[in-house]
Amino acid sequence: MKKNFDDLAERTPFAIPNNIKLGITKIKSLPLPDKLDCNLNKNHICLITDDGSELTIQLANSLIKEEWQVIILSFPGSIIPQKLPLSKEIKRMILVDLTEEHLKQQLDSVINNNGLIGAFIHLNPITVSATKAKTILKHIFLMAKLLKISLNEISKSQRSWFITVTHLDGKLGLGENNNFQSITGGLFGLTKTLNLEW
């Protein structure tokens, strides 16, 4: 049901042209997305951040079935304490601190020992404190900075990915359940901006 906004012009300090219709935003259910078949070169790496949940393992196993090389990046235990056991096919890289130098050293080690990183998937943890969420966000910004060369090099010949996965309320943050840190919205801005910046 649309509301009549004709009297809105009288209540606002500016005039609204008569030919512009105003409406109320509401949530609309969308159909499930189709599957996009994407292949990563077998000589390239898919780096996934560990959110401490089964999702990390499920995603890694799904990509391995597609013959992707997967490495899991785990944050220090002070940020995400839970690290579920991985299968033999999955390598894990654990950050011992959150400095840019250490992250660069670890990424260089992955590239030198395994090949270029062609896909990065950040799985944002569901429940962390605001301080930890801010620390993770900062580190993902650093990750974007440090992966720029690798991802751009690969994109010259095939698709490369920088993906962030967040958990909201299923209603784009507009629902009643707000069991998430609002600072993680910075991930949306980061992924949106990378395409413009790179």
Please name every model-derived segment:
Residues 1-142:
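Flexible, low-complexity flanking/linker segments at catalytic domain boundaries
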Residues 54, 126, 152, 196-197:
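A very general structural signal that marks isolated residues within well-ordered alpha-helical segments
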Residues 58, 145, 149, 189, ...:
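Alpha-helical scaffold segments in soluble metabolic enzymes
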Residues 63, 195-198:
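A generic structural signal for well-ordered alpha-helical segments
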Residues 83-88, 155-157, 176:
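Intrinsically disordered, low-complexity coil segments
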Residues 124-126, 136-139, 159-196:
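Catalytic loop of short-chain dehydrogenase/reductase
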Residues 146-159, 197:
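A short helix-coil junction within the Rossmann-fold of NAD(P)-dependent oxidoreductases
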